[in-house]
A protein has these predicted regions:
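HIT superfamily nucleotide-processing domains
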Residues: 1-92
Length: 92
């Protein structure tokens, strides 16, 4: 759509693993501004819509990594959408 794109993760951690990426460059959620609030909300609603389209009715997980200790490896905010199996906790 006009705000974000979705792609499949190249190293999936679940049977379904997509990335929802805003078109606006936001380095990480920890650096988002108040003006980015509509974009952040849109990313979550888009993740929910994709999960329903993919038939993830039993549940799904949404993850945002922030900073090196949070597992961030790409300096552009993105949402991980994982599903298709029972996901355990803690994740890693």
């Amino acid at each position: 759509d006009d705000i974000c794109i979705s792609i499949k993760d190249i190293e999936p951690q679940a049977p379904f693993h997509a990335l929802i990426i805003p078109k606006k460059v936001i380095t990480r959620v920890g650096e988002a501004d108040n003006e980015d609030e509509p974009i952040l909300g849109h990313l979550l609603i888009t993740a929910k819509k994709i999960a329903l389209e993919q038939g993830l009715k039993q549940g799904f997980r949404i993850v945002i990594n922030n900073g090196s200790d949070g597992g961030e490896t790409v300096p552009h905010l993105h949402v991980h959408l994982l599903g298709g199996r029972r996901l355990t906790w803690p994740p890693g």
